[in-house]
Amino acid sequence: MSRRHSAEKRDIPGDPIYGSVILEKFINKVMMHGKKSVARKIVYSALERFGKKLNLENVLEGFGEALENAKPILEVRSRRVGGATYQVPVEVASERRNCLAMQWIIKHARSKPGKSMEVGLATELIDCFNKQGATIKKREDTHRMAEANKAFAHYKW
């Protein structure tokens, strides 16, 4: 590993339909084995279902709100002090918030049995928009864990 400098962040161009960078990142997370066109079809049809089900005029704003509802604010990180390992609550960086929310939404959409990815993704986005479902439960569990370990907050980095 080179010690000179860290790699530069590359700018991601917006997606072709909505021009949104966040949606393009979401498509990249859905993509498997480099098949971006398949991922785009899945995401766009899921967004279409999502918009129709909730009667949204601007689907992108609805997607943003669903993503915002899924973002964690606090998480716990392991910190070794002496011989003991403590779960220390830490505020989540904004880039990581987006990343975790997207990962959780996609993970729970894939785990829905008997449904195609498009239907599962649309259902999970609707649930996030309405502040319910597996992704929101995961977020609440993460917050609950951080709250339970608040006593170790002074072990921050």
Curated annotation (Swiss-Prot):
User: Which proteins does it associate with, and in what oligomeric form?
Assistant: Part of the 30S ribosomal subunit. Contacts proteins S9 and S11.
Q: What is this protein identified as?
A: Small ribosomal subunit protein uS7
> Which NCBIfam families does the record cross-reference, listed alphabetically?
rpsG_bact (TIGR01029)
One MF term from GO for this chain? structural constituent of ribosome
Tell me which Pfam families the record gives: Ribosomal_S7
What biological-process GO terms show up in the record? translation
Q: From what organism does this protein derive?
A: Chlamydia pneumoniae
Cite the entry's keywords alphabetically: Ribonucleoprotein, Ribosomal protein, RNA-binding, rRNA-binding, tRNA-binding
Q: What does this protein do?
A: One of the primary rRNA binding proteins, it binds directly to 16S rRNA where it nucleates assembly of the head domain of the 30S subunit. Is located at the subunit interface close to the decoding center, probably blocks exit of the E-site tRNA.
Which CDD domains does this one have? Answer: uS7_Bacteria
Q: Please state which protein family the record places this protein in.
A: Belongs to the universal ribosomal protein uS7 family.
Q: Name one GO cellular component term.
A: small ribosomal subunit
